[in-house]
């Protein structure tokens, strides 16, 4: 059993990947957490550059609540929340720094984090995510910088790429399933 998180900019296939992994017998007893952005948006929480410190705190609380489980597969991690916080226009720089300092405390709770490389993957409009390529690149840049900055707090970080089947093979090799 492990806490497994996937990190990556929007529209790289995190949710699709988690749903496919959930079908495998090795993950039968895992809690699967996906697509919380739509749910939270429907509660009235602003997303992307419109997000607020309250909104990002709710997103962080969602991720932390997932970490209360010993067997977890999630399509978002605390790193994702941190990366989007950095792009929120209404949050002051000092508040962003304080938020990141607090959020990083939970990174060590993941047993594995898989970063999904966005190279060659087109943005899909699901009605929730931002479809602007420049914004997507900023989020990916933030994610990479956060991984560099806080990598020492991450137990097992792996980069995966390719189509869903190739990604699953890479994950299973890492997890030794």
Where in the sequence are the language-model features?
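Pre-Walker A (Motif I) flank of P-loop NTPase domains
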Residues: 1-3
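Hydrophobic anchor at the beta1->P-loop junction of P-loop NTPases
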Residues: 6
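The conserved Walker
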Residues: 10
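Conserved lysine of the Walker
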Residues: 14
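Short amphipathic alpha-helices and their capping/turn segments at secondary-structure boundaries
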Residues: 18-24, 56-72, 97-110
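Conserved substrate/cofactor phosphate-moiety recognition/catalytic segment
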Residues: 19-65
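Conserved nucleotide-sensing/catalytic segment adjacent to the nucleotide-binding pocket
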Residues: 45-93
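A glycine- and Lys/Arg-enriched "phosphate-lid" helix/loop adjacent to the NTP-binding pocket
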Residues: 89-166
């Amino acid at each position: 059993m492990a806490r497994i998180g996937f990190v990556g900019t929007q529209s790289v296939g995190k949710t699709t990947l988690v749903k496919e992994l959930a079908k495998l017998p090795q993950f039968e007893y895992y809690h699967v957490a996906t697509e919380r952005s739509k749910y939270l948006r429907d509660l009235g929480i602003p997303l992307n550059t419109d997000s607020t410190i309250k909104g990002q705190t709710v997103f962080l609380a969602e991720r932390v609540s997932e970490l209360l489980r010993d067997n977890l597969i999630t399509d978002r991690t605390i790193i994702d929340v941190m990366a989007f916080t950095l792009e929120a226009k209404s949050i002051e720089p000092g508040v962003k720094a304080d938020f990141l300092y607090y959020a990083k405390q939970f990174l060590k709770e993941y047993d594995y984090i898989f970063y999904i490389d966005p190279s060659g993957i087109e943005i899909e409009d699901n009605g929730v995510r931002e479809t602007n390529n420049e914004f997507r690149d900023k989020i990916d840049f933030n994610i990479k910088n956060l991984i560099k900055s806080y990598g020492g707090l991450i137990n097992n970080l792996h980069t995966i790429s390719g189509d869903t089947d190739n990604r699953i093979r890479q994950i299973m090799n890492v997890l030794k399933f």
